[in-house]
Structures are given as structure tokens and as C-alpha cells.
Amino acid sequence: MFQREVIERGLELLGASDPVLATHPEVVESDETPMVCSIPPRYDPDIPPPVDEAQGLRAAYDRALVACGTTSVGRAIDADSVPAALEVLHQWATGASWEEFDLSGKNTITVSHDIRTYYEEAAMGLVTGSTPGGRAAEAWFFEGTEAGRTIMAARTALKDQEAPFPFWFYMAPAHR
């Protein structure tokens, strides 16, 4: 119903002869409080934390895939490649040269998006409490997971290594 009201109000503006600034009576508030989602504990202390974390979420991701029947993971890498991509991002975040460690999928933007999507799809089966608000999943990913922190650290490392701007900047939302 809400979407219909917004569209109808927008269509009413088509008849205006001058520019119009209209305010919709309902405001959607953005809630950036991270959603509550328990991640399985570390299993293998001998591998980087984001790799171990991604492997631990695989069962939840698979359940979400069965429940939904589809996934948005796969623009650059598939679910099987998420741990390997996180391994490379971890190497970059800890000082390795971005030119020496090849990222599967090649495109940092779509690889980062696939990793985030993998996590968010897995999380939907693990989330507790009320329905997550707008940006709650984003906040959880970047603030509450090893993978999110690794992407942000890799982004900073790439910037510090003077990698091309588009290569690192778009790995995460600009406000991050």
C-alpha cells in the first residue's frame, strides 16, 4: 500500500506546469543499528579469521539458498570461492601488495559485493529479534564480522598503496 501511495503522489506531480517540491506525509527513517546475528565460533585458528568465519557460515548460506531457491551471489565469484577471495583480501589488509596477490574474479567491487551478499543471505537464517531495519544488515556486516572488517582494512591498504581509486573506493558504500 505504501509504495502505491508514493507512486500515486508522484504521478499527480506530472500535471504540474512548474517545478514542484512535494513532501510525502510519511518519512522512512534509516536505522543503522546492526542486526543481531550470532556467527558460528572459530573452528580453525590456523587460518585467517575471515576465511574461518566464511567457512563457518556455509551451512547457513546453503539453508538460505534452499529456502529461497535462488541467490544473488555470483556476479564475480560463487559461494565456493568466498573463502579464497577473503584470503586474498586478508593478505592485502595485512600488508601484501595488491599487484602480487591475484583476486579471483578480478573486480574488487563485484567480489566485495558477492562476499557481502553471501554473508547477508546466510545471516537471514541466523538473525534473531525483530525484522532488521534499513541498513541493519550492512552495519552488521561491516561492523560485526571479520569479513566486513577485512574488506574495510583491505580498502584502506589499497588506498595507502596508491592503487587506482575505483579499485579500492567502491569496495564498500561511500559513507563507510
Feature locations, PLM:
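A charged, well-structured terminal subsegment
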Residues: 1-21
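Short, structured coil/loop segments at alpha-helix boundaries
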Residues: 1-4, 47-51, 144-148, 155
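Charged/polar, solvent-exposed surface patches and flexible loops
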Residues: 5, 12, 59, 63, ...
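Charge-patterned, long linear interaction tracts outside catalytic cores
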Residues: 19-85
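Extended non-globular C-terminal regions
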Residues: 63-176
